[in-house]
Design a protein with these regions (language model features):
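Short, charged, amphipathic alpha-helix that recurs within catalytic cores of restriction-modification
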Residues: 174-182
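Active-site catalytic microenvironments for nucleophilic, acid-base chemistry
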Residues: 89, 93, 181-186
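Conserved catalytic cores of phosphodiester-cleaving nucleases, focusing on short active-site segments
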Residues: 83-84, 145-166, 179
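Metal-dependent nuclease catalytic regions and adjoining charged, substrate-binding loops involved
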Residues: 183-260
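Metal-dependent nuclease catalytic cores that hydrolyze phosphodiester bonds in DNA/RNA
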Residues: 1-144
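DEDD superfamily 3′-5′ metal-dependent exonuclease/proofreading module
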Residues: 2-7, 15-17, 153, 158, ...
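Active-site-adjacent loop/helix micro-motif of nuclease/hydrolase catalytic cores
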Residues: 142, 168-174
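A generic structural motif
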Residues: 137, 150-152, 199
Length: 260
């Protein structure tokens, strides 16, 4: 049963744990690093980008929300996780329901609205899925991460990142560039275009311009300059490396069975 359970884990989840059936112990890796291979760990792209200098808007936001900052960020993180999980199920052809098997709501109104917006994008533009939530890495530059969606649109290979934030940040461009380079190195997938599916956009509906992809409350922001953004990412990585010369994981160990 345990082996069956391990088999249904996503590939990127497997990169964050070690399972020892003989000791009946499972070790979860912290969220800052990925396991590339036995004894080899790379920092995550999102962790590296936390070392990107924050602008005045961020400093002002921290002053405004004060002690509520942690709560707000955790709540936003939970919403983003729910939207990403639902989006992955949708692109794989599964049905997503607002209610669980017991008739209880699984999602808040805000989360469900964002899921519906993503579904509208996918149903309207019908991208050809190549992969979703794919573990990517770069042995040359020593980082790893999870790419949201790789697909074909209009004959081009796109890397798409789903964002549920209230605003769009420059770090997102660098994140996409790092994933694009990681896909090329680890999966031999050449990315032609990158884009952000922003599910809290202020758009009022479809655009009359043919090259603009958007709907009510959502928009595909097309991000160019992969090479330039990757150079910026490497600069941020240098800042990260100064503060973290050794990427050593922190494990949380738990038994696989318990009895009281």
């Amino acid at each position: 049963m345990i082996k069956q359970g391990m088999n249904i884990l996503k590939e990127n989840e497997k990169k964050r744990l070690d399972f020892n059936p003989e000791l009946k112990q499972i070790n979860f890796l912290d969220r800052r690093v990925y396991k590339r291979s036995e004894g080899v760990y790379y920092p995550s792209v999102t962790t590296i980008l936390q070392y990107m200098p924050k602008n005045k808007f961020f400093e002002g936001w921290l002053k405004d929300v004060g002690h509520n900052a942690d709560y707000i960020m955790k709540k936003a993180g939970k919403e983003g996780t729910q939207v990403h999980e639902a989006a992955e199920r949708l692109v794989l052809g599964e049905e997503v329901s607002w209610m669980d098997d017991y008739g209880n709501a699984k999602y808040s109104q805000i989360v469900w609205e964002m899921i519906l917006k993503f579904a509208e994008f996918w149903k309207t533009y019908k991208p050809e899925l190549i992969s979703s939530e794919d573990f990517v890495w770069s042995d040359e530059h020593k980082y790893a991460g999870t790419a949201d969606i790789v697909c074909k649109m209009n004959g081009e290979t796109w890397l798409l990142d789903i964002k549920t934030s209230n605003s769009i940040h420059k770090s997102y461009d660098l994140q996409l560039a790092a994933y694009a380079k990681g896909l090329e190195e680890s999966k031999d997938i050449k990315i032609d275009r990158t884009g952000i599916i922003w599910l809290k956009a202020h758009s009022r509906g479809p655009s009359k311009q043919k090259n603009v992809i958007q709907g009510k409350g959502w928009k595909l922001l097309q991000i160019d300059e992969i090479e330039k953004n990757f150079e910026l990412f490497k600069m941020i990585y240098n800042l990260y490396s100064l503060e973290n010369p050794n990427t050593e994981p922190i494990y949380n160990s738990y038994p696989t069975t318990i009895k009281v």
